């Protein structure tokens, strides 16, 4: 069965994941088309919308790191230690990017060489999850493998053991060792329920855009190298040795008189307006179908407040949908991690973990401060502070305000006491 699963996974890599990754790094089909004749313009222009869409969306979705916390101090302290030890803010950002490129990604948990819990991310080319056939589709195995010196080697994880395998001299699966978790130490994170890349629905549009831009560049070269047409006089053979190189065409008049001489450039019909319309329409459709805002649009920078939020509404809705999927994955992350004995935590402590996602809107501190001020007396001070993007941690800010108020009160009491003493001294 393992051989069959790996063969199926390799086919998926070839048929789908390679295409998606190539698009992200700017390697599109137009770069691999057959070359045209040497004398014809043959530009290959690539506009990498796939990377722009992925990076722009993830900057909006997770550019502000996810705040993971718990109201129980001992759990909160451990989460902060665990996430800092594993550089989890960066891991989350990379995992989110992987999901946007491929439609899904994986996290793997392990005991590292220092006796601490390790967390790493994998893209779907490096492994796969096997689910059971129940209604809820629970994970049964996680498989990760690589090819080293033409030998495939990897690991299989179930709920208790980790098994090493390789195909040197045939497929061999070795005895398992306990991995220390009460469940499969891996989690699948998904971009959406369909596990589609964020730019997958626009892939054909991006290819069409690249083709249109390349043809437009070819037309520019064509007009720059237009043939000189000379009608009437007969040119000497020595002048026309290399017609294509010199780009000259000579048609001698029928009577050889040379009358009615015409000298101008030959050009094909100009389709510039049609090309521009096509390019502009393709660009609009790419952003419309991906639901990611084109923040480089000239009209985008002039928007503010509610108008800006309307322009980002589609991307905000997309981010909220991904937030729910990411939250599900993070719930499983901490449930599995807390099941390891070295954490000294209860497996159900993950129920006390809370997540705060902050969409990365351009900040207008003046508007935010005015909104917060207008809410005075209507909502709590903590809620007021949450409207100001410059305040990253409302609880910490409330503590600082409390300390400042206490210090101000002490200073006021000291001044009153000092003034009373001075008054008494003056009376004496």
Where do the PLM segments sit?
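Extended, regular secondary-structure scaffolds
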Residues: 100-101, 106-195
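C-terminal charged interaction modules
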Residues: 90-91, 98-101, 114-117, 128, ...
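Short, charged/polar micro-motifs that form catalytic or ligand-binding hotspots
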Residues: 97, 265-276, 316-323, 374-375
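C-terminal helix-loop subdomains that flank or include functional centers
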Residues: 246, 254-256, 281-428
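Short amphipathic alpha-helical segments
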Residues: 71-74, 83-87, 91, 99, ...
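A short, surface-exposed helix-loop junction/capping segment
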Residues: 73-80, 261-264, 312
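Extended, charged amphipathic alpha-helical segments
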Residues: 175-307
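Extended, helix-rich architectural segments
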Residues: 1-117, 417, 423-428
């Amino acid at each position: 069965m393992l051989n069959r699963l790996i063969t199926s996974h390799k086919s998926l890599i070839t048929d789908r994941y390679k295409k998606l990754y190539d698009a992200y790094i700017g390697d599109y089909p137009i770069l691999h088309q057959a070359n045209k004749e040497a004398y014809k313009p043959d530009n290959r222009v690539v506009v990498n919308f796939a990377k722009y869409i992925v990076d722009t969306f993830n900057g909006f979705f997770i550019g502000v790191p996810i705040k993971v916390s718990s109201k129980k101090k001992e759990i909160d302290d451990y989460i902060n230690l665990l996430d800092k030890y594993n550089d989890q803010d960066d891991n989350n950002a990379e995992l989110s990017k992987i999901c946007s490129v491929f439609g899904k990604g994986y996290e793997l948990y392990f005991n590292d060489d220092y006796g601490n819990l390790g967390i790493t991310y994998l893209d779907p080319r490096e492994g796969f999850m096997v689910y059971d056939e129940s209604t809820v589709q629970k994970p049964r195995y996680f498989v990760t493998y690589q090819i080293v010196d033409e030998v495939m080697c990897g690991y299989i994880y179930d709920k208790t053991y980790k098994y090493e395998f390789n195909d040197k001299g045939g497929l061999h699966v070795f005895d398992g060792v306990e991995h220390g978790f009460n469940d499969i130490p891996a989690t699948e994170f998904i971009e959406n329920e369909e596990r589609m890349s964020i730019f997958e629905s626009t892939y054909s549009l991006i290819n069409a855009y690249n083709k249109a831009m390349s043809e437009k560049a070819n037309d520019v070269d064509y007009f720059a190298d237009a043939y000189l047409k000379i009608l009437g006089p007969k040119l000497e053979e020595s002048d026309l040795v290399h017609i294509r190189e010199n780009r000259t065409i000579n048609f001698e008049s029928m009577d050889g008189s040379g009358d009615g001489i015409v000298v101008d450039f030959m050009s094909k019909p100009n389709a510039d307006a049609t090309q521009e319309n096509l390019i502009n329409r393709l660009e609009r459709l790419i952003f419309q179908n991906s639901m990611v805002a084109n923040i480089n649009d000239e009209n985008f920078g002039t928007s503010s407040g509610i108008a800006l939020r309307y322009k980002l509404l589609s991307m905000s809705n997309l981010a909220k949908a991904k937030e729910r999927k990411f939250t599900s994955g993070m719930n499983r992350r901490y449930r599995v991690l807390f099941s390891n004995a070295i954490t000294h935590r209860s497996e159900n402590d993950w129920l006390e973990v809370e997540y705060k996602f902050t969409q990365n809107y351009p900040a207008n501190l003046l508007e935010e401060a005015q909104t917060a001020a207008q809410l005075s007396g209507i909502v709590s001070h903590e809620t007021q502070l949450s409207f100001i993007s410059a305040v990253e941690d409302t609880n910490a800010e409330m503590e600082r305000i409390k300390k400042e108020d206490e210090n101000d009160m002490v200073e006021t009491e000291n001044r009153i006491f000092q003034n009373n003493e001075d008054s008494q001294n003056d009376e004496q």
